């Protein structure tokens, strides 16, 4: 069962955030992750969507997503995101039918 990282972000400093984008991809790939959504056009259909940037990353399983988030590889990259954006992030298990 896949694991997903879902983040909804407001980028406060786009120039500095670019460093995060450049560095995070290799860490995601190392743990078998792939981007499904990375910003892009959207339309809010119901409720409120607080931040303009949404990211969805798929990992082979839930544990791999957690392993990536807590990894030594992601550890030095994470503060760049935190310093240059506000928002929410979850790691969630996918379903199988």
Name these PLM-found stretches.
Residues 66-68, 72-90:
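C-terminal structural segments of small proteins and small subunits
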């Amino acid at each position: 069962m896949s694991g997903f990282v879902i983040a909804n972000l407001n980028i406060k400093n786009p120039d500095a955030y670019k460093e995060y984008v450049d560095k995070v991809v290799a860490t995601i790939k190392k743990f078998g992750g792939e981007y499904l959504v990375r910003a892009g056009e959207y339309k809010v259909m119901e409720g409120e969507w607080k931040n303009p940037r949404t990211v969805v990353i798929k990992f082979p399983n839930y544990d791999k997503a957690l392993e990536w988030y807590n990894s030594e590889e992601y550890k030095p990259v994470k503060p760049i995101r935190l310093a240059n954006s506000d928002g929410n992030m979850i790691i969630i298990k996918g379903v199988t039918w």
